[in-house]
Amino acid sequence: MCIRDSAYSLIVEDGTAMARKVRRGELPAPDEDTFADRYDAIDARLRQAGFSWYEVSNWAKPGGECQHNLIYWRSGQWWGAGPGAHGCVRLRGEGHSESGLVRLVNAKRPATYWDGLAGGGEGASIRKDGLPLPGSVVTTERLSNDDLRTEQVMLRLRLAAGLELTELAGSTGSAGSAGSKENTELAQVIERYTGLGLLDARGERLRLTDKGRYLADGIVTDIVLALGL
């Protein structure tokens, strides 16, 4: 029995066979109006079947939400196991990033990955970066507080639950001191989109409305810019 479903818009990636065919006129380019119509149809059909949207591109029956993806969208931690796997862990202590979150990428080649786990290989140098990681990890990216705030806005605002206004706070613990430029610009952006019926800012949370889902990327971009990130 299906308890969740996903529907993503088609993105034509550079360097693909489809991109070349679109460029030559052999295939039509994705059309935003067509996408909106199809999204409407999918949303209506899923709602009739007892599904609710919990992320812009994801629907589920009660209790059927994908917990794995929610960890990503809520800035949680996970460990990537296997060649080419990605992870994100929180580390504390001297030399670690402000947020403590570090993204990890394992070696793609299986032989290199297993060699790294055995204590050798190219990933061994990562351990000299002050991080207690296995040699299978070949890339790390430390997330600053601003990086984390940007991701929180980008990902959590796409959730039906939205995000708490306090999650827009910076390292000072507030979304901008009263009267500050950041606070004023953010308030103006929120007011504009709530006036258009695209955002719901009631209570202590900021949420996309059903109509706002279609313009989620633009709304998120404007909020991030207003925060100076």
Where are these regions (language model features)?
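Auxiliary N-terminal substrate/complex-recognition segments of SAM-dependent methyltransferases
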Residues: 123, 136, 188-191, 217, ...
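C-terminal scaffold of the Radical SAM
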Residues: 4-172, 179-180, 228
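Short amphipathic alpha-helical interaction segments
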Residues: 179-195
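Short, amphipathic alpha-helical interaction segments positioned at domain boundaries
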Residues: 211-229
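Minor-groove-contacting beta-hairpin "wing" of winged helix-turn-helix DNA-binding domains
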Residues: 205-209
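A short, conserved structural fragment
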Residues: 194-204
